[in-house]
Amino acid sequence: MRRFLFSDPDFQTAFKAFLDERRGSPADVDAAVAGVLEAVRTQGIEALLDYSRRFDKVDLTAETIRVTAEEIEAGAAETPADVREAIAFAAARIRAYHSRQRPADQAWTDEAGVELGWRWTPLEAVGVYVPGGRAAYPSTVLMNAVPAQVAGVDRIAMVTPPGKLQPAVLAAAKEAGVTEIWRVGGAQAVAALAYGAGPIQPVDKIVGPGNAYVTAAKRRLYGVVGIDALAGPSEIVVVADNKNNPDWIAADLLSQAEHDPAAQSILITDDEAFAAAVEQAIAERLKTLATGEDAAASWRDHGAVIIAPLDESPALVDAIAPEHVEFALDNPERLSDRVRHAGAIFLGRVTPEAIGDYVAGSNHVLPTSRAARFQSGLSIYDFIKRTSIVKCDPASFAVLGPHTVALAKAEGLPAHALSASVRLPSGD
């Protein structure tokens, strides 16, 4: 864990060096991924099944690769009642939040008489990647599938590594209306969604988190399909004063540290004694936390405490551009309203980031690795597209046509000019 004093003369230099550090050391998997993608593209289902045997040690067929409706129902029934209730509660709130994002079509006639506008249409098919193992989270299903459903996507295809499927993940899929689930993971699953493979039909966009192989596959396939983002390790910044319970703030910092040894948790406070109390609370919690090994590595290698006047916190947050930021303060808006670069902002002393991960309704798929400078979190805008509409009548074309001809000639594109000039009263 690093400690920074804003008052130190070399603070800005040291802080910038800290931000520029690369978190995690992902293997160079691009070459291996390229081979997997090409094999699935050219060999289809045969390559997909072969990779499942080699990498996942399961023997699937084109008939057994799909999760049946009966398996989905059984998984949902196996999920404890309180978890099913929480899934339904979360899904309803996510649905309500994202329903408010629906944009309206626009149409108008301008002063030249040209009819202009745009219309929004949903994507036809979307693939959702849901990791397996410890990272098989029902919230991943909800946060990716529910907005797609709200947007009006016709087909949502989910892929998840083979093996014992987490009942809660199947319960979440049922709640989100996902009936097409394929037991395949890794780069080969991403390739199958992009190119199609046997019974798996191609999609228009792929969303959802994954390991280095999945991320590399999404990067390579961008252009063949759309993707949501290239997700990095989780991040949180907590801006807190000494009126907070140190144990609460420690828990908030650990909530992201437990995801991954490469995750990053940063405390900004104006009180050194409070910072020390939070550090002590973290040390105590790590002794009993089930995910303590990952959390301890994250806090040790990538954590930071910044002692600075709270009025400086918006500028510091903008420099970090974190995935999540909490302002655990009275009247937090006085500072948060000045923040420009953050994936999600949580306000007040009783609004921990974990609420946003599950049940607030806002999306937990957020930009990482300082991408909040130019990117937003997942929303229905990721599942719709805007098409421009233009209509001229003879009178309005007579206004626009000559200018079109002039610009086309200036650009050396005679066929463009001709396309307009032949429609003008003077002809070509």
UniProtKB/Swiss-Prot annotation:
- Output the superkingdom of the source species: Bacteria
- From which source organism is this entry? Caulobacter vibrioides (strain ATCC 19089 / CIP 103742 / CB 15)
Q: How is the cofactor bound?
A: Binds 1 zinc ion per subunit.
Q: In which pathway does it act?
A: Amino-acid biosynthesis; L-histidine biosynthesis; L-histidine from 5-phospho-alpha-D-ribose 1-diphosphate: step 9/9
Annotated active site = E323 (proton acceptor), H324 (proton acceptor)
Q: Quote the HAMAP family the UniProt record gives.
A: HisD
GO terms, biological process: L-histidine biosynthetic process
Q: Which Pfam families does this UniProt record tie to the protein?
A: Histidinol_dh (PF00815)
Keywords attached to this Swiss-Prot or TrEMBL record, sorted alphabetically, are: Amino-acid biosynthesis, Histidine biosynthesis, Metal-binding, NAD, Oxidoreductase, Zinc
The molecule here is called Histidinol dehydrogenase
Give a yes or no for keyword NAD in this entry. yes
What is the name of the gene encoding this protein?
hisD
What are its cofactors?
A: Zn(2+)
Residues at which Zn(2+) binds:
Q256, H259, D357, H416
Q: Which reaction is this enzyme known to catalyze? A: L-histidinol + 2 NAD(+) + H2O = L-histidine + 2 NADH + 3 H(+)
Recorded GO MF terms? histidinol dehydrogenase activity; NAD binding; zinc ion binding
Q: EC number(s) of the enzyme?
A: 1.1.1.23
- Name the PROSITE patterns for this protein: HISOL_DEHYDROGENASE (PS00611)
Q: What does this protein do?
A: Catalyzes the sequential NAD-dependent oxidations of L-histidinol to L-histidinaldehyde and then to L-histidine.
Q: Which residues bind NAD(+)?
A: Y129, Q188, N211
Q: Where does substrate bind?
A: S234, Q256, H259, H324, D357, E411, H416
